[in-house]
């Protein structure tokens, strides 16, 4: 299987961790989506257009993403501090 391209919304990067172990863990998960685009999150939500999106908790951050399989892309739409 060909690796997918992973795109991160620039607004998501604003709230992403800037350094340290948290950033490393978040970035490793995002990179893993290229070779495992069928990855599912810890829970499922619907976005503003009704599309199913997955939310994965990585450390203290919630990463929202969805796979666009016809074009071999994964879109990361949000990276936010996870609720406690």
Predicted regions and their residues:
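A short, compositionally biased N-terminal segment around positions ~18-40 that is enriched
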Residues: 19-37
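Enriched for short, Lys/Arg-rich terminal
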Residues: 1-5, 14, 21, 27, ...
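A short, surface-exposed loop/turn module that caps and links secondary-structure elements
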Residues: 31-57
């Amino acid at each position: 299987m060909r690796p997918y391209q992973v795109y991160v919304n620039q607004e998501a990067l604003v709230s992403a961790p800037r350094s340290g172990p948290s950033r490393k863990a978040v970035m490793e998960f995002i990179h893993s989506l290229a070779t495992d685009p069928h990855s599912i999150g810890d829970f499922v939500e619907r976005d503003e257009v009704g599309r199913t999106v997955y939310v994965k908790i990585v450390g203290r951050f919630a990463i929202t993403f969805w796979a666009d399989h016809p074009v071999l892309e994964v879109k990361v739409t949000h990276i936010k501090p996870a609720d406690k």
